[in-house]
């Protein structure tokens, strides 16, 4: 199962592209609210209802951190969310972050020995072993990506990681990508 963290102010395209493409690939996805209810409001005032709240979530195959401001700061100020992310990391599970979210991973020490990318205007804030100017960067169990414009590529790399290239190609073909 793939966990996706939703905090108020999340970037809708980055989060929901991953949910949609992963489900099309047959990956079970759990949308996790960091709020006191299952409802979360995105950065562009799109409300979604998550599957559960963080207190009811478990460590699974991976965790995705969408970008967005104030979405990423809202994840970062939640100590339970940080612990949840670190538990996935410590169990060598997939950690995928896009846009502003890789900067959070850097600040909590998860990119110390990794190459990564983030939203171009935030590259100076990215703490990692090597900054790479690519749309999606994969280093071991960490996948990072630039922005809403690279969200589908990000989703397909997550599918490749959890399934394989063939499944990712089938989903791409199904949406005429």
Q: For each predicted feature, which ranges?
A:
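A conserved active-site-flanking secondary-structure segment within enzyme catalytic domains
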Residues: 111-136
């Amino acid at each position: 199962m793939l966990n996706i963290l939703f905090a108020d102010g999340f970037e809708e395209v980055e989060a929901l592209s991953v949910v949609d493409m992963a489900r099309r690939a047959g990956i079970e996805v759990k949308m996790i609210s960091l709020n006191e209810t299952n409802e979360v409001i995105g950065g562009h005032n799109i409300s979604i209802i998550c599957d559960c709240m963080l207190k009811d979530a478990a460590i699974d195959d991976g965790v995705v951190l969408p970008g967005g401001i104030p979405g990423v700061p809202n994840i970062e100020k939640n100590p339970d969310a940080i612990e949840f992310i670190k538990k996935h990391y410590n169990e060598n599970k997939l950690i995928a972050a896009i846009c502003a979210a890789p900067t959070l991973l850097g600040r909590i020490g998860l990119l110390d020995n990794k190459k990564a990318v983030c939203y171009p205007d935030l590259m100076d804030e990215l703490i990692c072993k090597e900054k790479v100017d690519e749309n999606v960067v994969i280093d071991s169990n960490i996948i990072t990506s630039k922005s809403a414009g690279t969200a589908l590529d990000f989703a397909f790399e997550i599918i490749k990681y959890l399934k394989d290239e063939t499944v990712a190609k089938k989903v791409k073909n199904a949406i005429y990508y």
